[in-house]
């Protein structure tokens, strides 16, 4: 398609009516605009602070399709740089992570300090007899880097709102993972990486707001693992949770704001996640009192939930998997998944967390495979001309949004709804059609007000 004006984008997504045209998942022109206006100016997750604890530690990642290296400085601060030599655009760092005193380009040998300064140019005197202003040719620095309770984010846009303002009420939900115990969290093990042939918005939307698929897409896993109270055989250990949470929950909530979203069940027991090892379920019971003191009852009990910070940072409560959906064109995403656990947990519990996350949501995880097949098959369908120009229904519980009076913040709906999907694509369209953050925020404010008027 050819984008000539903003109305061409809003024609593809009508959040107020619950309509979406699947061209948004496949069009290469839209994808290039996303790289510029979403990945070029939204806050993007870079690394967990535990992955770069010491001066000189670095972690290689992406902001959209731009390779970025995140580095711990000598003074303890964190900087991030475009992984691009200023001479001929070669990467200066190929290692996934490590510790270094300098980054040296393998093409012509230009070297940069961990602070990004150009510190050495081979044969400088004879190659540049007129002189070379090295101060001018340091690595391009990501201008905005902030840390939220251990999660390091970056943003190319200096006019963007602060990270805490960008997160909004989503920070309240995020704290349920990051702030359960004194000492915060850390990454356990390495990063698992794999490719899925689908558009990045499909998994981001599902993690943000789709509990609806679980009973159907994951039916076999539910049947095998969701043991009932009194059952003797528990596939994941003697202390495994003894019922599917959706059978016993007293309520269920979906939250949406500014493209972010999550969904969860309100439970009465601190082990309500059927996908984790018995050792993990037991750990949640044993540490519940501390979590409730720090977070309150709702978040301390919130152990079966799905979440996404727009655009591409997702996690699952209880299961301890956190992942980033790195876009690789309009029809492919590179998944980076890692296990995040309480730093205060014992080594045995951390190992159980890692086992649970890998078994369910690693590249060969029994739930991950269900999800990936859905996304890949959707992308295949959208190769067709008629299919990608059709209209899809996004009306679930349209008009049922509300603001709760029980302390759960933000615009909410029942967990089986598409409030999050509508809000995510409204934010997507607002970002693509707005020149400034003032415009983006005003459009979001108007949309949020309409939901609960």
UniProtKB/Swiss-Prot annotation:
Keyword Oxidoreductase: yes
Enzyme Commission (EC) number: 1.14.12.19
Gene Ontology terms describing biological process: 3-phenylpropionate catabolic process
InterPro entries: 3PPDioc_HcaE, HcaE, RHO_NdoB-like_C, Rieske_2Fe-2S, Rieske_2Fe-2S_sf, Ring_hydroxy_dOase_asu_C_dom, Rng_hydr_dOase-A
Pathway the protein contributes to: Aromatic compound metabolism; 3-phenylpropanoate degradation
Cofactor: Fe cation; [2Fe-2S] cluster
Top-rank lineage group of the source organism: Bacteria
Annotated positions binding Fe cation: 213, 218
Protein family per UniProt: Belongs to the bacterial ring-hydroxylating dioxygenase alpha subunit family.
Function: Part of the multicomponent 3-phenylpropionate dioxygenase. Converts 3-phenylpropionic acid (PP) and cinnamic acid (CI) into 3-phenylpropionate-dihydrodiol (PP-dihydrodiol) and cinnamic acid-dihydrodiol (CI-dihydrodiol), respectively.
Protein name: 3-phenylpropionate/cinnamic acid dioxygenase subunit alpha
Gene: hcaE
